[in-house]
A protein has these predicted regions:
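Surface-exposed substrate-engagement region within the catalytic domains
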Residues: 31
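Nucleotide-binding motor/catalytic cores of P-loop/tubulin-like NTPases across gene-expression machines
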Residues: 12, 35-36
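P-loop NTPase catalytic phosphate-binding loop
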Residues: 3-7, 17-28, 36, 41, ...
Length: 133
């Protein structure tokens, strides 16, 4: 354990290099009591509801408790990777859920590849409306 973590009485801190656009270094300290981030609250947030992105994706909350979103249209490539249990499926479900809440079936079509036939089974009922054919 480093001196900084002992002074802050935490097990882990993450130090980021110079923060973009600021002359500062970022220090992230985990909350002592983690909170669940509800996708329902994020979808119901004013920021998500009033968003004008072409393909809005709400991923969660920032360390300053703001809704974190991005426009999938401005993301030409997206690689989702990680070890077992790291949240890949949760992230993909957040993307799909965001799009389902903001787009009508006439505006959005999905092509879902699920080799295990488990990850996307909960979307089976939606396929007749959102499946690209």
């Amino acid at each position: 354990m480093g001196r900084r973590t002992v002074c802050l009485a935490v097990l882990h801190v993450r130090i980021t290099a110079a923060m973009p656009g600021k002359g500062a270094v970022g220090i992230e300290v985990a909350n002592k009591v983690p909170q669940i981030v509800s996708m329902q609250k994020i979808i119901a947030s004013r920021r998500f509801q009033e968003c004008r992105y072409e393909l809005p994706v709400a991923m969660g909350r920032t360390i300053t408790d703001e809704v974190f979103m991005f426009d999938l249209c401005k993301t030409p490539h997206l690689l989702v990777a990680g070890a077992t249990g790291q949240g890949k499926s949760v992230g993909l479900n957040a993307i799909i859920t965001s799009l389902l809440y903001k787009k009508h079936p006439a505006e959005l079509k999905f092509v879902m590849v699920d080799p295990k036939m488990v990850e996307f089974s909960s979307y089976a009922k939606l396929l007749k409306h959102y499946l690209a054919v």
